[in-house]
Regions:
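A short, proline-enriched helix->beta-strand linker immediately N-terminal to the Walker B motif
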Residues: 170-174
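ABC ATPase nucleotide-binding domains
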Residues: 245-278
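Helix-to-loop junction immediately C-terminal to a conserved catalytic motif
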Residues: 65
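Conserved structural motif at the start of ABC-family nucleotide-binding domains
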Residues: 19, 33-34
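Conserved ABC transporter NBD signature motif
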Residues: 73-81, 90
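The feature captures the beta-strand-to-loop junction immediately N-terminal to the Walker
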Residues: 50-52
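Catalytic Walker B motif of ABC-type/P-loop ATPase nucleotide-binding domains
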Residues: 176-180, 185
Length: 278
């Protein structure tokens, strides 16, 4: 059973496998960025992290990845505190796709994807047959096989994002964290990337700004506002006109479309008119 206010299973015997955050808080520059946030993604599903700028989405992803430590609360991986799990072990199970990626080294696409095998190899050891098979599989799953010999510098934004995902897949993770991967992509590339991630059937947590993309592709969403969880649960239950007005301060019309009844959101204007003279 899931409580829509927290998105957490209310069953005391709930499975503790995978990556989860319990009661996580984090401050930065004296400001509370995350305030008692709990997140327990269901295995094999895509969870969207939603919220306005500054709501804590990227910070939560960095805490889940172990890049930042929470000030209170705990992040666990298969029931063990993430801070006690060796970094190489974490890297073999949790992959991260950043919002922006660049390199000063003139890598080919295949070489960039091979970086995903680093957690599986000893220092200075050559690639194994298993490494190369993982790279070939990642290139194929992301539709990059024909671009394997291309230089990173010649790639479009959408192609670079696919390379990042291929690199993450080469890690052979169980959990995939993505920080606003659709930013700066045109509509076709946004849809292609979302369909790719949704079809992976890994446990994915993705920060998103576009509510309609979240409605189309996510299994569950968690809505953050000023560092706190406002709502969490299936997209059909969470993305309501009332929540959009409360969190984003805009009026919206939410309709159910298609055989699956997923929400479609049409924005109508600000939720409140500006004060006279404001």
């Amino acid at each position: 059973m899931t409580d829509i206010s927290t998105g957490v299973s209310t069953d005391a015997s709930a499975d503790v496998t995978g990556l989860r955050a319990d009661g996580v808080s984090r401050t930065a520059g004296g400001a509370l960025v995350l305030d008692d946030v709990t997140l327990a993604p269901r295995p094999g599903t895509l969870t969207g992290l939603l919220g306005p700028n500054g709501s804590g989405k990227s910070t939560l992803l960095r805490v889940l990845a172990g890049v930042l430590a929470p000030d209170s609360g705990v992040v666990t991986l298969d029931g063990d505190r993430l801070s006690t799990v060796p970094r190489r072990t974490v890297a073999r199970q949790v992959a991260v796709v950043e919002q922006h990626a660049d390199t000063q080294v003139d890598l080919t696409v295949a070489d960039a994807v091979r970086l995903g095998r680093v957690p599986h190899r000893r220092a200075w050891s050559p690639s194994t047959a298993a490494d190369e098979e993982a790279v070939r599989s990642a290139l194929a799953r992301t539709g990059l096989t024909d671009l394997a010999a291309r230089s990173w510098r010649t790639l479009s934004g959408g192609e670079r994002q696919r390379v990042q995902i291929a690199r993450a897949l080469a890690q052979e993770p169980r959990e995939l964290l993505l920080d606003e991967p659709t930013n700066h992509l045109d509509i076709q590339h946004q849809l292609d990337l979302m369909a790719l991630v949704a079809g992976l059937r890994l446990t994915c947590v993705m920060a998103l700004h576009d509510l309609n993309l979240a409605a189309m592709f996510c299994d569950h969403v968690v809505v953050l506002h000023e560092g706190r969880t406002m709502a969490a649960g299936p997209v059909e239950e969470v993305l309501t006109e009332r929540l959009i007005a409360d969190v984003y301060r805009v009026r919206a019309s939410v309709t159910r479309e298609g055989p699956d009844g997923r929400p479609h959101i049409r924005f109508l204007g600000p939720a409140q008119a500006p004060a006279p003279g404001g």
